[in-house]
Amino acid sequence: MAKRIIYNEQARRALERGIDILAESVAVTLGPKGRNVVLEKKFGAPQIINDGVTIAKEIELEDHIENTGVALIRQAASKTNDAAGDGTTTATVLAHAMVKAGLRNVAAGANAITLKKGIDKATEFLVGKIEENSKPISDSTAIAQCGTIAAGNDEEVGEMIANAMDKVGKEGVISLEEGKSMTTELEVTEGMRFDKGYISPYFATDTERMEAVLDEPYILLTDKKIALVQDLVPVLEQIAKTGKPLVIIAEDIEKEALATLVVNRLRGVLNVAAVKAPGFGDRRKAMLEDMAVLTNGQLITEDAGLKLENATLEMLGTGRRITINKETTTIVAEGNEKAVNSRCDQIKKQMEETDSSYDKEKLQERLAKLAGGVAVIKVGAATETEMKDKKLRLEDAINATKAAVEEGIVPGGGTTLAHLAPILKEWADATLSGEELIGANIVEASLTAPLMRIAENAGSNGAVIAENVKSKPFNDGFNAATGEYVDMSSAGIVDPAKVTRSGLQNAASIAGMVLTTECIVADMPEKKESAPAGAPGMGGDFDY
């Protein structure tokens, strides 16, 4: 296919046009008075959402070059989402502001490479300052505040997540399910999560989110490598008759057996997913035994005289639901509390008997995984459209609270970045010079962009509010919901430090890449062939 090649200013301007389109679509959702965006779907009802990264993923432009700009900014949003799970809109607004300010300087003749160095140095300085100003989370009130803000000021959601964290611990697993009623409910059940994902992405049942969700599956647990599909045939035939899904957790599944499972999955013969067992050696076996107890099944191991080819349905475990993504597997089981408790007592005894601190630590990990359980939030709503929006907000809120537990919290509502702007200016003037200083000034000018946008979405003058906030103490900011200046921590308007940091780092990274772009190679738009004229009486000539 023929390519189109664009250089210099023309290339950067084309990228900028794409960036403008995406940033504007996403920025309207920022803040407590942010609006919603409607996504048209080829199949099913339109989706009404308020989540930056989901909107960014939907935007595709006709012009290939402008689409490249969209893809770059989308990357800032999705990387922030991967790292912190929230703050995607802030990252987009920041990246857009940095690109706009940077391109003006490049057009005026500044050296893009030196500007990028200045941007990187300023970002490094700011990351240190965010860390300095973050406060560790001490109680469930702060967790509830974080969840409330991330869910778009929904206090009920914040309280529910704080409640869930109280029950399963800060490291515990919180899972989301679509509920059957109008209200959102919290339930704590037996379950565990481990750090292994599906062996092949073809097992994903939801290709948009790239995860496999299997309801009421059978679970086959074995500590051997499955090399030949013949070993699995007897058990697969039995499961196919029941019509239920199957999850295989094994040491490994080799190519031939894996290919057969994938083909059966794609053809719809059997809903199956395969996962490698976590850990190694004896520890792997112990974890598989824990899973067997949890799911009310047996570990099929030759040590116990059990072979795969002789496996029956009675030997398989069962669960309420299993969710598998590329990195983790979450098992939600139920109705097996007695067996789980006695297994936990057994692990506690082993901990008392061992002298090795390493073994003790690993036993403690197993105990936490098994005893912690899983908090399941059943999302309730009147319509499917509302449920999808609520689910995305809840997901953001869960991620934000986990990020807050990790790295602490800072004043929210764009306040932290706005207060850091004068501090950055002072540092840059003292330590940088020439075009590096201009690079740092680009970052400094962009730091107020999220606050300005939050204020504008609430119908206030963003520039005036940003200047007013800068002159106040570090904790004071603008509450866009009420239109007042308040102490952000007391008002419960807080952001996880990790979210603010990730957003800033990813925005600076993408801005640096756009500014140093000198040439774009993209596909030529395909010429649409005009339709041939119809024969007389066939719609080409009209006879009236």
From Swiss-Prot:
Its main location: cytoplasm. One of its GO terms (molecular function) is unfolded protein binding. Its EC number is 5.6.1.7. GO terms for biological process: protein refolding. ATP binds at T29, L30, G31, P32, D86, G87, T88, T89, T90, G413, N479, A480, A481, D495. It is found in: Cytoplasm. InterPro entries: Chaperonin_Cpn60_CS, Cpn60/GroEL, Cpn60/GroEL/TCP-1, GroEL-like_apical_dom_sf, GROEL-like_equatorial_sf, TCP-1-like_intermed_sf. SUPFAM superfamilies: GroEL apical domain-like, GroEL equatorial domain-like. It comes from the Bacteria. This is Chaperonin GroEL 2.
